[in-house]
Amino acid sequence: MATDKGLEDVPEGQIESNYDETVDSFDDMNLKSELLRGIYAYGFERPSAIQQRAIMPVIKGHDVIAQAQSGTGKTATFSISVLQKIDPTVKSCQALILAPTRELAQQIQKVVIAIGDFMNIECHACIGGTSVRDDMKALQDGPQVIVGTPGRVHDMIQRRILKTDQMKMFVLDEADEMLSRGFTEQIYDIFQLLPQSTQVVLLSATMPQDVLEVTTKFMRDPVRILVKKDELTLEGIKQFYIAVEKEDWKLDTLSDLYETVTITQAVIFCNTRRKVDWLTDKLQARDFTVSAMHGDMDQTQRDLIMKEFRSGSSRVLIATDLLARGIDVQQVSLVINYDLPANRENYIHRIGRGGRFGRKGVAINFVTADDVRMMREIEQFYSTQIEEMPMNVADLI
């Protein structure tokens, strides 16, 4: 596959767009009528910035690199493109979508199924932590779209259970995250096992060297689309901080907040799994109802907790960054960073949840003396202001 040297001279891990056409209505994209029906039924009215720019080149068959964060509508961008390109009458895998976490893969699967509701297609999630036998059975039925995590997908292709001969499109979502989690080898292997003619679509919030290497090795003359940070979703989200002198005082601060704020639904982020468990125990001991979720839990447990949270029967979810990218709960109006994220890129993944697509939200950051520098960095990185939390914060939620 051809290399694209132009990508290597990019400043600060940001790609340069080389494609600027926009289509600002779904009706003007020449989509199948059943697909269009699914898009509107899903609740979309007009395309977001990335959808206006990226859907058309993908549908036209170009390899596409899109740099965009969560909350920009990127999942629907490639879901719509995939659904437009596949042939529902052919019962075999025509599109493969890889994601870094099981939660994200399942979320993508839900979007594909919902938007493709009138199209008579099958979409199967091929993820670790589930029964291999069930996977094999589902794959033998020939679902047109597979969404999965690299380990399990690689395994199924190697066992020749997932057949790739009809593959038209390969989508890598959150490529930076997948490569930083050590999936590089499996991803390279999967590329080698796909037909030469497979179209490649890569989405990534950042463009570190390892992502650029994938694009140069496996993509042909790609269309590059950068959705700049100012089009992203900190807009509409009120961001505050509470100065907490010592780490030990955070728990009391959180308990006081619980009293003040009768929260609709909230996610509280901690930086480690142990901290999540510790905080959950402490809050439950104080008779607060909270649920917790992190990567040490098995899949069944995680699914159950997400289900309870989505349905509203559990109100407060304590989680690690692993889940910042997999939680898409429309009614979350409050995010609390009990710990500031260890890297600034994760800040938008955490709080971009609360205000997606113009929904309002509030983010409250607990900031110790040691965190002040990181908070300033976050403000600078996102060109945003995080202000001290006012007394009447309850009125804002």
From Swiss-Prot:
Q: Which residues form the Helicase ATP-binding domain?
A: 55-225
Under catalytic activity, the entry for this protein gives: ATP + H2O = ADP + phosphate + H(+)
What's a single GO CC term here? cytoplasm
What are the transmembrane regions? none
PROSITE patterns associated with the record: DEAD_ATP_HELICASE, HELICASE_ATP_BIND_1, HELICASE_CTER, Q_MOTIF
Q: Where is this motif: Q motif?
A: 24-52
Q: Where in the cell is it found?
A: Cytoplasm
Lineage: superkingdom? Eukaryota
**Which positions fall inside the Helicase C-terminal domain?**
236-397
EC numbers: 3.6.4.13
Q: Name one GO biological process term.
A: cytoplasmic translational initiation
Q: Which residues bind ATP?
A: 68-75
Q: Which SMART domains match?
A: DEXDc, HELICc
Similarity comment text for this entry: Belongs to the DEAD box helicase family. eIF4A subfamily.
The free-text domain remark for this protein reads: The Q motif is unique to and characteristic of the DEAD box family of RNA helicases and controls ATP binding and hydrolysis.
Q: Subunit structure, briefly?
A: Component of the eIF4F complex, which composition varies with external and internal environmental conditions. It is composed of at least eIF4A, eIF4E and eIF4G.
Task: Relate the protein's function as given in its record.
Answer: ATP-dependent RNA helicase which is a subunit of the eIF4F complex involved in cap recognition and is required for mRNA binding to ribosome. In the current model of translation initiation, eIF4A unwinds RNA secondary structures in the 5'-UTR of mRNAs which is necessary to allow efficient binding of the small ribosomal subunit, and subsequent scanning for the initiator codon.
Q: What is this protein called?
A: ATP-dependent RNA helicase eIF4A
